[in-house]
Amino acid sequence: KKPPRLVLLNCGFEEAFDEPALEGNFSGLLLDLGVSSMQLDTDSRGLSYRVNSDLDMRFGGSGISAEDLLNSSTEEQIYHILRNYGEEPRSRAIARAIVTRRKLSRIRTTFELREIVESCTPKPLQIRTLSRVFQAFRIAVNRELEVLEYSLRKAIEMLSPGGRIVV
């Protein structure tokens, strides 16, 4: 039996490399990392600062939610998430504001997080800052960089000599 010329999978990278359809060597692999703005704006998982919803941010539904991460991490851990995954210049002030605010009550919604970020960000910079903050927590919650690193290692193992990976 001849192997298929094209295999399309709609799943997370961690699951993709366990698929029986991916046995053997490939001359090319395409990894789509994109999250579309339409997904963010219409999503009810807390991925967007434009839609008020629960602070979940999980793509798959398992693992720690953004709400749990925000409410259980130390100020230093939050700072590192914002700095490393969002490259946010105001990481320290935002981390401090999150920890201060959660002493009053648990942070549960996207609009609560948005309000905290806006409170310590000059108006002209708020949209850009909100984008970086939400990106940082999404990456942390979904372990996106760890998953990508794992996926690239697995993809290289499956590649035929001279094959290509497109990310």
Task: Give, region by region, the residue ranges found by the protein language model.
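S-adenosyl-L-methionine-dependent methyltransferase catalytic core, i.e., the SAM/SAH-binding region
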Residues: 1-166
